[in-house]
């Protein structure tokens, strides 16, 4: 699956990636798994170290690498060997045959990062934190690795109100980055409890029904895409296989998911002292 797949490209463009963004990275890095473009609002600067939680094929890592320039570092974290392998292949391939020199990828859980405390300028993530079983542990780990004054700029799914039972209990909705989400107020409170201040969570107004409209096109996954710790394990966030995608579409068609959930931009700063 790549930017050459119509569904993957449509989802990426619906959530903030421009044609130039997608053309500037290896096509296989875009797997149609987005709910926003965190690099667009992270204010990344040359020389910074940025970490992407749940990097998948490396889409946001490669975009971040261009912004921090060769003197900076872009680090991808993913829980599955398949995704790390894919990301490393993409990094070696690069664009126009020129490999990336300032990226690295690590196999790890996002609540147990293989990074030193106070070593990171910015943490980004795209439609992944909502899938974490212990979100508070993730928030604490982000705070640990950030430098004083460091920031997080995350694109995620959060709830405006509680989901209907049929949706919240359905694993397919979980794979679709919906049922794992928490209320916006709980997201805000969790970050503040982890020590972040200020915190701002903004509803982007993006249409979440795009998942149902394009998921069956973007779900060109291998047969083992649902064989791991969770169905998201090898496929990444927001990415059921084609058969599951059709079931997800049928489920979400019975509801206007925009009434319950939102694609949000999350900004938070670790106090300087």
Question: Model-predicted segments: where are they?
Answer:
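Short, glycine-/aromatic-enriched active-site segment of Class I SAM-dependent methyltransferases
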Residues: 158-178
């Amino acid at each position: 699956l790549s930017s050459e797949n119509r569904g993957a490209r449509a989802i990426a463009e619906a959530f903030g990636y421009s044609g130039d963004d997608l053309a500037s990275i290896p096509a296989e890095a875009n797997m149609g798994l987005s709910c926003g473009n965190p690099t667009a609002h992270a204010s990344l600067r040359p020389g910074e170290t940025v970490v992407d939680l749940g990097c998948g094929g490396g889409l946001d890592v490669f975009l971040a690498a261009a912004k921090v320039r060769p003197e900076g570092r872009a680090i991808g974290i993913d829980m599955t060997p398949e995704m790390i392998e894919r990301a490393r292949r993409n990094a070696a391939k690069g664009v126009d045959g020129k490999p990336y020199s300032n990226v690295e990828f690590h196999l790890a859980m996002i609540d147990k990062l293989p990074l030193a405390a106070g070593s990171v300028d910015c943490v980004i993530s795209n439609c992944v934190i909502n899938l974490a079983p212990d979100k508070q542990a993730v928030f604490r780990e982000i705070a640990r690795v950030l430098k004083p004054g460091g920031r997080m700029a995350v694109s995620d799914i959060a709830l405006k109100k509680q989901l209907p039972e049929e949706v919240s209990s359905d694993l397919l909705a979980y794979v679709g980055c919906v049922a794992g989400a928490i209320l916006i107020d709980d997201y805000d409170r969790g970050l503040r409890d982890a020590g972040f201040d200020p915190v701002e969570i903004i509803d982007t107004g993006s249409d979440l029904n795009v998942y149902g409209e394009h998921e069956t096109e973007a779900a060109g996954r291998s047969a083992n895409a649902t064989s791991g710790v969770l169905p998201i394990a090898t496929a990444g966030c927001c990415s059921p296989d084609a058969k599951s995608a059709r079931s997800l579409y049928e489920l979400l068609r019975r509801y206007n998911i925009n009434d319950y959930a939102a694609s949000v931009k999350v900004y938070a700063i670790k106090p300087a002292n």
